[in-house]
Structures are given as structure tokens and as C-alpha cells.
Amino acid sequence: TTLVLYRMGDFYELFFDDAEKAARLLDITLTARGQSAGKPIAMAGVPFHAVDTYLAKLIKLGESVAICEQVGEVGASKGPVERKVMRVVTPGTLTDAELLNERADALLVAVVSQSVRGGVAKSTDQTPCALAWLGMASGTLGLTECTQRDLAGWLARLQPAEVIYDRERIPPALGPFLAQPRGTAFTPRPTWQFDAGLGQRKLCEQLKVSHLQAYGAESMSLGHAAAAALLSYAEHTQGRALAHVSS
């Protein structure tokens, strides 16, 4: 789940279960205001000028955070001030130097396996897999296809901050990583986002080319599927096109 921070004046506030979770993880005060369904509304907040410090703590713990900013003017109309989610910060989509800490870049990796649907896939060591990765700060983009046997090795080399995967086709090699994440966030995504045709189009648009032959990726259909989910997720979290990604 994603924690939601609402900008309210000089603070970013969280409510209900988000407030309780944030209070526990960040060691901040949990309060209450008003009522909903006869129960007090849990509330916790952090000063807006220190939000990056708290974001860094949450990201280090593997959490994802949506930043909801005020877009309407206070007092311009009756009722609540209009707010809008401006960006979503996840472990693999960091671009702010303050949040990256010791990492030069935080890699976001998408993994897909050519296998049957329904939970953890029944496959062999030779089952085709693909990885697509993106360094959000550096703007570097990579793509490879491999076998199930080599998937764990690729993840060990890349050391991603976040891995997204098809929730209906989970590569067995991901099992040990999911059981013991060890500093990597794992985010399931719906199967329809791993669309090879969409991925090929997105790659061409992103790289400003008409085909992928120069990159040796024209026929990597499984890689295109991973790229589709990767680029869609990155664009969603940033709330904009990835103009800095060009290689």
C-alpha cells in the first residue's frame, strides 16, 4: 500500500491507518481529530520543511509515498481546499539527491517470465525471462532477456532499489527475494501492464527512434513486455513524461 501525505498549511498530514503506520515507523506523535463512523480520526503529521528527512526514512524502510499538494487557494471557496497527488515516491523511482543517500542512483527493475499464469509459475531453469531497468536519477535504461536460472544473478548484479513484477506470473527465482527482501522493495503489477506491443512503442517513443535494431532489441518481445510495465510505472510515479531518459 502507499502512504498518502496531504499538504495542510505548514505540515504534511496522514490520516486513519496511514497515520498509525507513519507514527510507528517515524516515531512521531499520533493524535486524533473529529470523528468518522463514530470513531476518532487518527492523524499524524510532519513539518513541510523537513519532509525530505521523513521521506528518506520511509523509503529506506521500503515504503511508497504519494505527495498530495494544495492546488486551490485557501479561502477561495467554501469547503476543503482542492488537493492533487503531484508525485509518488517509491524506492526505485527516486530522483532527489537528498533521498538517494549513499546510492549514486536507485534502479527500478521490471521482471517478467514466459510461463503459465496463476501464482508462482511452474517453469524450468531454461524458461525465458526478461528484465528492464531504469536509473531515475541518471536517466539510463537497460534491457536483457535471460533464463530462469540466470535471473537471480542479474538481480544480484543490478542491486535494484525496487522490483516490479507480474502478479499473475511470478518467476520462481523471485521466491527467495520475496521471502527476504534485504533492502529491495517488491511491487506487484497487473498482467495487462506487461504488454510487448506497448513496450516496443514506448521504447521507440522514449528513445526517439522508429525501430530498436540499433540497440539490438528489435526482436526482444519478452523484454518489450518488461519495458512496458517499467516505463508506465515510472511515468505514473513521476506524474510526467520521462524527458531525461534517452539512452
Predicted regions and their residues:
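Charged catalytic and DNA/RNA-contacting regions of genome-maintenance
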Residues: 1-247
